[in-house]
Every structure is written in C-alpha cells, then in structure tokens.
From Swiss-Prot:
Homodimer. GO terms for biological process: L-lysine catabolic process to acetate. It catalyses: (3S,5S)-3,5-diaminohexanoate + NAD(+) + H2O = (5S)-5-amino-3-oxohexanoate + NH4(+) + NADH + H(+). The keyword NAD applies. It comes from the Bacteria. Keywords: NAD, NADP, Oxidoreductase. Involved in the anaerobic fermentation of lysine. Catalyzes the oxidative deamination of L-erythro-3,5-diaminohexanoate (3,5-DAH) to 3-keto-5-aminohexanoate (KAH). The keyword Oxidoreductase applies. One of its GO terms (molecular function) is L-erythro-3,5-diaminohexanoate dehydrogenase activity. This is L-erythro-3,5-diaminohexanoate dehydrogenase.
Length: 344
C-alpha cells in the first residue's frame, strides 16, 4: 500500500495533521510502498531539546534515557514536548519500498544521515546502548522510517561517521549563513563557540571578506580563547545572551559603536530574542537558527523597540546544505580538528 509522500498516513492524533506537529504518529515498522526502513545506530538530539531533558533529569543519564524512551513511547517519534524539536539520526538502509526502488540513489546497506527532524520521523527504540551528553548523542538499537519526501545524506568516505553526523546535525546554519552574508557585512554570532556557531563563524568570515567584520558572543574566557585561536572571528565578546542590554553595549563596543548588518542566533537556551535584535541596524537581518526561539517574543520584541529588521526562521533545510557543511570540514583544518576534539 502507498502512503502520502509527506507521511500523513501515519498521523494518529490529531487527524488531518502533518507528522511534525502531530502529537502522536504510528511507529509500526512495517513500511508502506513509498517508505524507507532504517536500522538506526545513533540519534543526534537537537541541542535545545537535549539541554532541556538533561536539566529536567538532573544530568542523570539513566533518567535521560528513561525520558527519551517515554517520549518515543508516547509519541512514536523523538519530539521533545517542551521544545518541540527533535534532532537527526544515522543508520543503515534495511529496506526500500517497492515504489521507490530504483528511483532513488539509495540501496540496501547504504549508511545515511537523515536530514529531516526526528520530530516527524517514526522511531522505535529497542534499547538505549549509550548516552553521550557532551555531544547530545544517543546510541541505540532501533528502527526508523523515512518518508518519500524525506531528505538525507549518504555518509562521506573521507571522514568518520561521527564527525560527519556532528556537522550534518547543524547543516542548515552555515548554509543559510552562506546565502545571507555578503562582502563587507558586519555579523554578530550568538553562541559562537557551539557546533553551529563555529560553522557559522567560519562561513561568515569567508563571505564578509577583508572589508567585513565577524564578532562572536560566548559565555566565558575559555570559549573566547578557543575562537580567537581558531582565527574564524575578528573579535569575541563575553556576555549572557539572555541579557539584551549587556549584549547591546558589549557588541556595539566591539564594532566601533556601529550596529550590525546581520545577527545569527545559535544559542540553545530561551529568552535570547532581543539580544539578537537590538544590535542590528534598521533594514538588517536576524537569523534565528536556535530551536529555543519564540516567534511571539521576537515579533513583539522587535516592534516594541521600533526595529525594522528581516527575521528569518532557522529552516534546517536549504538547497545544498549538506554539501556546504561537509565542505567546511574539508577546507578548514582548524574547524575539522576542533570538531574532532569536541565531538569524537
């Protein structure tokens, strides 16, 4: 039997919904003729989601595991009920539905990373083998289903699977940065020392050229030293992204008193909307990659301070995003080495 290419045939509650906003979907692993069955090796849980679960569990890995099993048991997918976000997975193609066989560039045995969110992916976990809180990674035995419309990336052969997965997990951020940033722009990146932040810093620095400026915002001296040593920013400021007035003052001071053309929010905590908006000039752009962003706070906040800025939701997908992101690891030895130290 053939299902809807967007996966609506698996929605249990509420009827008529798409799989991502649905409260519950079917994780029956008998596939429809236009679905793909994946033998799952690991989940890379979205940073905002993992942080929330970890704090709720008091940093106890057994409680984190129990919470993940509870969520998947209730929803049929790994979608954090607080943040609404999911993550991505890595696995091996186990079966391809007859309507897709020979029509896609996948075969049984191929290793892939899914580039659609776990928040819409039917998932069944048989066992949680290990949890790595430092890299938001959960190694499991289980199965998942990719819909006909689902996007994916075959894992590259010139780098380790874990390294590729760490980068692909945030593929939308550097790719959108590549589209948004122009030569001569001044760019403020919040959460610059994190995985997506470092990628965005590198891509922004490349795009602004010698006449532009990239400033990273981090939480501590250790992160500041790391970014400056990497050479992927022009300056680094230390401030809490949850304190917008502090961010405004320190960020403008780092840009010769001038407002920025673009800000990129890669922070994994709530209440950072105004820190992204205040330092930006009228007519500038604010890119919210963070899944902890509130549309209401951003929209009303910008209005409240009279800011006429373009605000972009951090769409995890943009054309060519996997290739752009993996290319950063290939062309930048310092980014690749840093990722290997942090995420392997």
């Amino acid at each position: 039997m053939k299902g809807c290419k967007y996966g609506t045939h698996r929605v249990i509650e509420p009827k008529g919904s798409l799989p991502q906003p649905a409260l519950k979907i079917s994780n029956d692993m008998n596939i429809f003729s236009n679905e793909i069955l994946i033998d799952v090796q690991a989940l890379n849980v979205d940073s905002a989601s993992f942080t929330q679960i970890e704090e709720e569990a008091g940093h106890d890995t057994k409680k984190i595991a129990a919470k993940i099993l509870e969520i998947v048991g209730e929803r049929g997918k790994m979608q954090n009920p607080v943040t609404g976000s999911g993550g991505m997975l890595i696995g091996t193609i186990e079966k391809i539905g007859e309507d897709l066989e020979g029509k896609i560039d996948l075969k049984v045995g191929d290793k892939i990373a899914t580039l659609v969110s776990l928040s819409l992916t039917p998932l069944q976990i048989d066992e949680i083998i290990d949890i790595k809180p430092d890299i938001d990674r959960v190694e499991i035995k289980g199965k998942a289903i990719l819909f006909e419309s689902g996007i994916y990336a075959k894992l590259p052969t010139d780098m380790s699977e874990t390294l590729a997965l760490a980068a692909l997990d945030v593929a939308g951020a550097p790719a959108q940065t590549a589209k948004l940033v122009k030569p001569g722009d001044s760019v403020l990146i919040l959460g610059a020392a994190g995985k997506s932040g470092m990628m965005c810093c590198y891509e922004a620095k490349k795009r602004v050229g010698p006449t532009g400026r990239v400033v990273g915002l981090v939480r501590n001296e250790k992160s500041k030293a790391k970014l400056l040593e990497m050479g992927i920013v022009d300056d680094v400021i230390i401030a809490s992204a949850q304190l917008p007035v502090e961010v405004l003052e320190t960020s403008l001071a780092a840009n010769n008193g001038n407002e920025y053309d673009i800000s990129i929010n890669c922070v994994n905590v709530e209440n950072t909307e105004m820190s992204s908006i205040l330092p930006i000039r009228n007519g500038g752009t604010v890119y919210f990659f963070s899944m902890a962003t509130s549309f209401t706070k951003a929209a009303l906040g910008a209005e409240g301070v009279g800011k006429d800025v373009d605000m972009i939701i951090g769409n995890g997908y943009t054309k060519g995003h996997a290739e752009i992101t993996l290319q950063i690891l290939r062309e930048s030895e310092i980014v690749r080495t840093t990722f290997e130290k942090m995420y392997l």
